Swiss-Prot record:
Protein name: Dihydroxy-acid dehydratase
Sequence similarity: Belongs to the IlvD/Edd family.
Cofactor binding comment, as recorded: Binds 1 [2Fe-2S] cluster per subunit. This cluster acts as a Lewis acid cofactor.
Catalytic residue list: 519
Amino acid sequence: MIPLRSKVTTVGRNAAGARALWRATGTKENEFGKPIVAIVNSYTQFVPGHVHLKNVGDIVADAVRKAGGVPKEFNTIAVDDGIAMGHGGMLYSLPSREIIADSVEYMVNAHTADAMVCISNCDKITPGMLNAAMRLNIPVVFVSGGPMEAGKAVVVDGVAHAPTDLITAISASASDAVDDAGLAAVEASACPTCGSCSGMFTANSMNCLTEALGLSLPGNGSTLATHAARRALFEKAGETVVELCRRYYGEEDESVLPRGIATKKAFENAMALDMAMGGSTNTILHILAAAQEGEVDFDLADIDELSKNVPCLSKVAPNSDYHMEDVHRAGGIPALLGELNRGGLLNKDVHSVHSNDLEGWLDDWDIRSGKTTEVATELFHAAPGGIRTTEAFSTENRWDELDTDAAKGCIRDVEHAYTADGGLVVLRGNISPDGAVIKSAGIEEELWNFTGPARVVESQEEAVSVILTKTIQAGEVLVVRYEGPSGGPGMQEMLHPTAFLKGSGLGKKCALITDGRFSGGSSGLSIGHVSPEAAHGGVIGLIENGDIVSIDVHNRKLEVQVSNEELQRRRDAMNASEKPWQPVNRNRVVTKALRAYAKMATSADKGAVRQVD
C-alpha cells in the first residue's frame, strides 16, 4: 500500500497545525485520511470558454465526496487568445502555459494533494494543466468546459451565411466585399454561447487529444458546453479520480498514473488522431511540451513519421463548414479513433482512465463499431440549442439521427480519406533544418507547391500593415521573423495576418512563413514553428527581400534559393553587427516577466518549453 501524499498534513501529532487549518477550510473529522483531490478549475469572466465553469467545480466536488474523496478547489489563470490577438497581449499567451503548469505544481505540492481533476478548456489552459499532470504524475482526470455552438447569420442582402465563428468575423473585417451592416451581422452571431470556439481550433483540438491520450472521458472533446449531457462528464470525472486513487494508493497500480497512461504509444495515438482530424498546428507544440515534461521519448521526428502514414479523415472549420457539433453528431473522437483502428493505424496496447484496453473502449463508444452502448448512442445525439447563452447545461436538444456516412460525412473512413497524408506536415530544408509545421488540411492540394519572392517583416504588426495597405502582392511569400519563443518573446499567433490575407483575397495567392505560430483558426498556405528561430541564429533571420522561397508540401521541403556561401556571408555580417539576431526598428514593450521566459525558452521543435538545466 502506498501512503497518501496528504498523510503528512492530515495524520499524526506533527500534523496538528495543518489539520487545524484544514478544519478551517471545512474539512470534517471523518475526512482526515481520505485522498485529497485538487479540483483544478479555470473559471474566469474574461474567456467565453471558461465563463460557465464557476459552479462546475461544485459538481465535480460533490462527485468526489460521494466516491470517498476530499475535494479542494483552486483556480488557475486563463488567457483568451482571441481577445489577446493582434496586440501586445498575445506576447503573454504561450508563456501563460508555463505559468499555469507552475501554479498547478505549486498548489498541489504545497498542499500535498493526492490527485487532480483538471477543469480546463481553452488554448493554453489544457496544455498547461497537461504539462503539470505529466510533471506531478499523480492520479488525474481531465474534463473540459466543452465547445461553443457554431453561429448562424444572415447578411443584410438576405443571403444565408454559412455557419459562423470567430474566424469568419475576423476575415470579414478585412474584406471590402462586406459592408458595415454585414460585418455587424457576422460579429453578432459568430460566438453565440459559452464554450471553446466552435471549430477544430487549438482549444478543441487539445481537448480531443486528451481523449486519445487516455486522460479524459469519451465525449470530452466534442460534447457542447451548453448541453445537459455534459453534466454527466463532470460527475463521472469526480467519481473516476477517486477510483484511480484507490487503485494507485490502495493497490500500488502505477499504470493508472499519467505517465502509465500517456506512454509513447499513447502519444503516437494522439498524434495519429491529430493528423486524422486536421487539428491545430499548436497541438504539435503542446504535445511535444507534454512529452518533455513527462520524460516521454517522443519528438518531432516521430510526428513527421506519423504524418506520412496517417490520412486526413475529417475537415472541420476553419477548413470546412463543419464545426464541433457536427463532429459530435458523427460520433466524436471515439468514431475517429475507430476508423483509425480499423485502418490498422493505432497502437492497441494502451489504456485510459476509463478503460483497461483500446478494443473495449472503442467497442463501447464508437457509434460505428456495431457494439455501441446505449449510453454512448444517447450522448452523441446531443445537439445545439441555437440560442445565445453563457449557461452550461442549458439545452437538451437532440439530433434526429447520427451522421454515420463514412464516405461523405463529417468523419470519413480510411478508404474515403481527404488525403493520404495527415492534416499536419513537418517541413525541413535550409530555412528549417530543425523543422517547420504546416496544416495541410487547411489548403487545397494544388497549392502544395509554391515558389515566390520573399517579403520580409520583423513583427506581426508590420505583417498586418503590409497586408492592409496592399503593399504585399500576389505570388509573394510573407516572411514574419523574430516572433519565436525567444524573439517575440512568446511566439505570437499570426491569426490576424492569415485572416487578413484571406479577407483581402490573397489567401490562395500568397504564402506566409514564420518562426511564430498560428491560431488553430488559421488557414491557407501558412507555415509556422520555423526552427531554429531567428533569435537563435536561424536561417529565417538571414532571408532578404526578393530571395526566392520554395515550398513543397508533397516532398516536405522549405528552402530559400540562396547558396550556402551567400548564407554564410550574411551570417558573418549578422554576427559582426551591433545587435546580432535582433529585429531592426521594432517598437515593442517587453516586460521583465516576458524577458524571463525569453531567456529560458527553447525553439518550437522542443515545444517552446523552458530550458532550466
